[in-house]
């Protein structure tokens, strides 16, 4: 919303990054950052920057597959229990799902929320069996009222006095592990996490947030599985928490080399909650969602790639701006042309329909909301230093005149 006069610092963004790398075995580095509007070396940032991050990652040293000290990220299975990855959403190509990496990774970005601070390690007990363990102890931003945590603040912005008062008010501890077994075409894994806060977590549980977590001690446990046979691939994960459960299963089939078909089914119960989960879906959390997603990718001609998808989803419980269970659809078609390695372009059309409460009806009337998006993007790289990206976007929102 622009620079506000209530901000405590200058309207300048600044960050410093340092990375040391030795082969593919050792990574070390640090990050310092202040957002625009945050003070530097003053007030609540008397040590200079607003955010500091340090990490050390050792990997692929015999049976020691990875060892992280400092800030790190985690991802296991399909992300129903644990994932701090930066996912690209449903518009990602079908083939990209096979390239998703899991395990322990260094946290080298300026993201002030999606990371852990402590130690994590993965050890290969045998060629087929590996074990991971991790522990994290870190401060978090939030709001505390009468000794209870009422909300967790995720933006990492501390520009005004109100935002600065939320800084580092909470302490979270997390511990857990993963056991993974792989033999030929089969892979099995178990992931468990247990986390606590230094104060009771008691957000306001009303309306659509009625089934969110509350208390002080939380856990999640999930089993992930995968099987490959010739041109078939099946992957999935099923998880439970203090209440509710979630399951995501994906089937891929490639009848010929240039065609891939994918079917994804997810079921996230309205009362399932995993604070560090991040997976495939329409919503931003692994909760209160069911759906079937179908995708088809093909490269019938040289330099051309086509992708078509359709998603039919529903929300069994209330959502933001909809006071009853609802449903929707999401369709996409995209054509990508890559004449050279340094030049590519695509044209994409997307159609989405969801339901919303009619303004002023207090949830008694709902309307379908339609979103049409047309995008053209051109990417060009002259060399390793200079590159350009041009995007043309058209968006149109509308609703029916009568309530549904």
Residue ranges and their predicted role:
Residues 103-111, 146, 161-169, 175-176, ...:
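Extracellular/periplasm-exposed beta-strand and loop segments of Gram-negative cell-envelope proteins
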Residues 1-40, 47, 51-57, 62, ...:
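Compositionally biased linear targeting/interaction segments
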Residues 3-13, 23, 116, 170-203, ...:
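Exposed, low-structure sequence patches enriched in small/polar residues
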Residues 42-44, 93-98, 151, 202-212, ...:
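Solvent-exposed loop segments that connect transmembrane elements
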